[in-house]
Amino acid sequence: MALHRKAEALLSERPDIAVISECARPDILAKRGDTALSNCSRLWMGTNPNKGLGVFAFNGYTVARFEPFYPTLRFILPVRVDGPRPFNLIAVWAQNASAGVTRKHQSGPLRRSFSKYREFINSGPTVIGGDWNSNKIWDKPGWRINHMAKVEILDGMGIGSAYHAVTGEPQGEEKTPTHYWRDRRIDGPTYHIDFVFAPNAWLDEIRDFSVGSFDDWVGNGLSDHVPITIEF
């Protein structure tokens, strides 16, 4: 939340495409003076005007929502990205199933989106990125919502994780966190729950990859998450 406090840090990354969770609606950003974020090509979905999923395009890129769109998949946004290198994007701020043990019977919105948007995903190179709110460390035997169930589905579609392709680390053994939970301390509970998946052919073309540092994003109070930045 409070994207207006983070805009300068975000724009300093000079992104072509930015996927931002817990993001205010663009008209609210405009009222707060965030002209760079409110005047660019952008999309937003959510039920709380101050806390949704935003996609912002810069540097000659534009974004348009793919139709048909299924807003009940909270919050999964299918996006056509046009520009110097067009591609499809599934922007993610996954609101995973709850209710304790009953989760074993629920697939969750992100996994369901792979079926709902399969034609879209298959229509061209597709990047799937954002806050997945999941990791192999929480998987339970036979549960449909498992993180690895989603990873395996995407693997069958020729789509893999950029972080794991670059680092060689196994799923569930990530050494670099993306989320500093609760007390936002570098030695507190930390997790790797933000991911960018891309076509395997693109993973071979990664020119630059980074995970934001604690000091730049969390230690100074900007966020409890750090960004993943990729240049293909």
Describe the residue ranges of each PLM region.
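Active-site metal-binding loops of divalent metal-dependent hydrolases
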Residues: M1, C23, A94, W132, ...
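Short catalytic/ligand-binding loop motif for oxyanion handling, primarily in non-cytosolic enzymes
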Residues: P26-L29, G52, A97-G100, N135-D139, ...
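Surface-exposed cleft-lining segments at the edges of enzyme active sites
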Residues: R65-E67, W93-R111, K136-P141
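Surface polyanion/phosphate-binding segment centered on an Asp-His-Pro turn
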Residues: W217-F232
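Conserved beta strand-loop-helix elements of the APE1-like EEP
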Residues: N48-A64, D82, E173-E174, Y180-E205, ...
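Short, acidic/polar
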Residues: M1-L11
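Metal-dependent phosphoesterases centered on the DNase I-like endonuclease/exonuclease/phosphatase
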Residues: I17, G108-P199
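Structured beta-strand-rich core segments of catalytic domains in phosphoester-bond hydrolases
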Residues: I17, S21-A97
